[in-house]
């Protein structure tokens, strides 16, 4: 079935933000996306939470059984903050499913993968993109998590609440040379 009209209505009504799939994690972003492959994020994470059943909403308020929803909620929160900072949303998923990155930003000369981690993980996809010679536009990445600000192995870590500062940081950014 074709849902294009419904999706366009949700976008035009300001209910969802669209995140397009990149054909390859390379520049330019807008010329490198497949408009038929996309994810939708709510413009207001409260709308996402309101769609949960009452028991699940109670779980969120009492901070239990959060692991089921945590990834989707944090990813939606970051998507919302990026859009409000003026970014268009792009993600990448390799057809084999072995590599997936949540978002991409652009600096003057680089493509920056952004990974949203709900749990402490090893950021396998982010590390693969940074270390691969195949993606020359990618020199470093950003990881958003519950952790503090940090840097290790070409990955800059920021707490979720710093998402709105990424645009300002990106403009004055000078990569650390390892």
Model-derived segments and spans:
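Generic hydrophobic alpha-helical scaffold/packing signal
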Residues: 79, 83, 104, 115-117, ...
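Accessory nucleic acid-recognition modules appended to NTPase machines
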Residues: 1-100, 104-108
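Catalytic cores of nucleic-acid endonucleases
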Residues: 118-159
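Short catalytic-loop micro-motif centered on adjacent basic/acidic residues
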Residues: 91, 113-116
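Structural motif
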Residues: 110-112, 140
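Domain-level recognition of nuclease-like catalytic cores that cleave nucleotide substrates
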Residues: 147-178
């Amino acid at each position: 079935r074709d849902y294009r009209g419904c999706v366009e209505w949700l976008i035009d009504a300001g209910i969802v933000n669209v995140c397009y799939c990149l054909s390859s994690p390379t520049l330019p972003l807008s010329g490198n996306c497949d408009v038929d492959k996309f994810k939708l994020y709510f413009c207001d994470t409260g709308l996402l939470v309101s769609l949960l059943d009452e028991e699940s909403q109670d779980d969120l308020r009492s901070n239990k059984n959060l692991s089921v929803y945590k990834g989707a909620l944090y990813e939606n929160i970051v998507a919302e903050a990026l859009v409000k900072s003026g970014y268009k949303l792009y993600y990448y998923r390799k057809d084999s499913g072995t590599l997936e990155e949540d978002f991409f930003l652009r600096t003057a000369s680089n493509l920056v993968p952004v990974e949203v981690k709900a749990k402490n993980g090893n950021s396998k996809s982010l590390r693969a993109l940074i270390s691969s010679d195949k993606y020359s536009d990618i020199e470093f990445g950003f990881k958003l998590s519950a952790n503090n600000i940090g840097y290790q192995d070409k990955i800059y870590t920021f707490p979720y609440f710093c998402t709105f500062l990424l645009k300002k940081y990106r403009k004055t950014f000078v990569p650390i040379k390892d």
